[in-house]
Regions:
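Membrane-lumen/periplasm interface segments of specific transmembrane helices
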Residues: 66-84, 265-387, 398, 402, ...
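Transmembrane-helix signature of polytopic, membrane-embedded enzymes
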Residues: 153-156, 174-213, 231, 247, ...
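Transmembrane alpha-helix segments characteristic
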Residues: 393-416
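Membrane-interface transmembrane helices that cradle and orient dolichyl/undecaprenyl
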Residues: 193-194, 198, 236-247, 441-442
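Multi-pass, polyprenyl lipid-linked donor-dependent membrane glycosyltransferases
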Residues: 161-164, 179, 206-235, 247, ...
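Transmembrane-helix motifs of polytopic, lipid-linked glycan transferases
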Residues: 144-145, 157-185, 190, 382-390
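Loop-to-helix entry region of an early transmembrane alpha helix in multi-pass inner-membrane enzymes
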Residues: 127-133, 137, 141, 149-171, ...
Length: 480
């Protein structure tokens, strides 16, 4: 039975029961809107936007509440550590500010004070010991400038930069989420929330809340670079979605200098160029099938040539920091040796691809699980993830660029990442997943609040176990 005008179906219910996609991934154009949708979208030449107090202002409030909650949890964790310190890292902290700047934040502070070493420290076995080349310079540079300009402690400046970047990130993520939801309904990426879009606006805000209270989200109020790097990454994705490829270049460069995101970002931008070029070619073949195939292929390539040059530049940004390390130390593999040395490996041991997952879990299980079972588990994990990403709900909810970024970053982790206790934090760049998770069960009143509550409990556990907990449990190093 058709829905009554007074109570239309939600956009998610409509997407799950209508519309289709022609392949395992979304096409560049959303499914053609229905006649009813076209009338609704075009009936007013000047559509009325929802007021700010219903869109980006709630996004800021959600983020501020999450930050306040995390700060209170950090204060409680500090009090517990001072009474009963479980970790050598967390003993005798003079106050909360110091507590927010432990672990990797200390390396960023060292970069600000001493810059990078000219010689790599070596262990007895020849592997490179822990050193600051493993960390990108941007966060240290910005927080250092803030500290110098205002004459404040670098630790306070680092936390302040993270808080400011986090608030900006809340607005950018909200815009990306609402734009992705609008794309499915309108056929194009539109970051406006109009009157009549209340359902999509609520889902976008809930998705932001799920992300803001996710297990590793407390890191956004510390001296770590995550808030700044995720902001720059989200802005890079926004530039790609909107086709702002010139603006993308400086933003992508800053992203690559904030965290080791240059490789997956370059892969994403390059594959997006290929996606756009193939789509242009297919559109030409559909519109004018009588034209020569090579002529259409050349026209599609020529039309996207500038985008290709931009993609190649973005790929090159991944080599800026390694090149800096090579020039300063005189050792061409300085950055690679540092990264491998963090897990007590040497360059001559070679970089493991995929296999590091099996080897690391073999260490965790102390060799009690056969390697064939762990390999089967890894293959199952990879196939399950991409099967989930290929489902109709996923393909029709995420804008293709957000879908492609998620797929690229996940692939990067499967290929290169050494799974440690830091994996929860390393998953923060896949922010589109919070939109997917929040959009399930559209009729449930309890689902999304329970998601936020589960994330809050998870963040408290993450903080107590990894930030203020013991350094080691059995063979597992507990690092945030």
């Amino acid at each position: 039975m058709a829905q009554s005008p007074e109570k239309p179906a939600s956009f998610i219910e409509r997407d799950l029961t209508s519309g289709s996609s022609t392949g395992p991934v979304p096409t560049l154009k959303a499914s053609r809107p229905s006649a009813k949708t076209r009338v609704r979208n075009t009936e007013s030449p000047n559509p009325q936007k929802l007021p700010a107090w219903r869109t980006w202002i709630p996004a800021l409030i959600i983020w501020a509440l999450a930050c306040a909650t995390h700060l209170a949890t950090f204060a409680y964790s500090l009090a517990e550590d001072q009474r009963n310190p479980l970790s050598n890292e967390n003993k005798n902290h003079p106050g909360l500010l110091s507590y927010l700047n432990i672990w990797d934040a200390g390396w960023y502070r060292d970069i600000y004070k001493e810059w990078y070493p000219t010689e790599l420290p070596l262990r007895a076995d020849g592997s490179v010991s822990f050193n600051s080349w493993a960390f990108m310079p941007l966060h240290s540079m910005i927080s250092g400038k803030v500290a110098d300009i205002f004459g404040i402690d670098h630790r306070l400046a680092a936390v302040g930069v993270s808080l400011a970047a986090g608030l900006a990130l809340a607005v950018v993520l909200y815009r990306l989420f609402i734009g992705s939801l609008n794309w499915r309904d309108r056929g194009f990426f539109d970051t406006r929330a109009l009157v009549g879009d209340e359902s999509r606006n609520r889902i976008a805000l809930w998705a932001l809340a799920v992300y803001a209270f996710s297990p590793a989200s407390p890191i956004f109020i510390t001296g770590y670079a995550e808030a700044l790097s995720t902001l720059l990454l989200a802005m890079s994705v926004w530039c790609v979605v909107r086709g702002r490829y010139i603006l993308l270049l400086p933003v992508a460069l800053l992203t690559a200098l904030s965290r080791p995101l240059g490789v997956p970002l370059g892969a994403f931008v390059g594959l997006w160029w290929l996606w756009c070029t193939v789509s242009d070619y297919l559109a030409r073949r559909t519109d004018e099938p009588s034209q020569p195939v090579l002529s259409d292929a050349w026209a599609a390539f020529r039309g996207r040539f500038g985008q290709l040059l931009g993609a190649l530049l973005v790929c090159s940004f991944a080599f800026v920091h390694p090149l800096h390390a090579a020039l300063r130390t005189g050792r061409m593999d300085a950055y690679l040796a540092t990264e491998l040395g963090w897990s007590f490996r040497k360059v001559e041991d070679g970089h493991q691809y995929f296999a590091q997952w099996v080897h690391q879990f073999n260490l965790y299980f102390i060799g009690s699980v056969p390697a064939i079972i762990m390999w089967a588990g890894l293959v199952l994990l990879i196939l399950s993830f991409y099967w989930w990403m290929s489902q109709k709900f996923t393909r029709t909810l995420l804008h293709p660029a957000l879908w492609l970024w998620t797929a690229c970053y996940a692939g990067y982790l499967f290929i290169f990442w050494l799974p440690t206790s830091s994996t929860v934090r390393i998953l923060l760049p896949v922010f589109p997943l919070s939109l997917l998770i929040a959009a399930y069960l559209p009729k449930s009143r309890m689902y999304r609040p329970l998601l936020v509550l589960a994330g809050l409990l998870g963040s408290a556990l993450w903080m107590r176990l990894l930030w203020g907990g013991p350094d080691v449990i059995g063979p597992v190093w507990l690092l945030p």
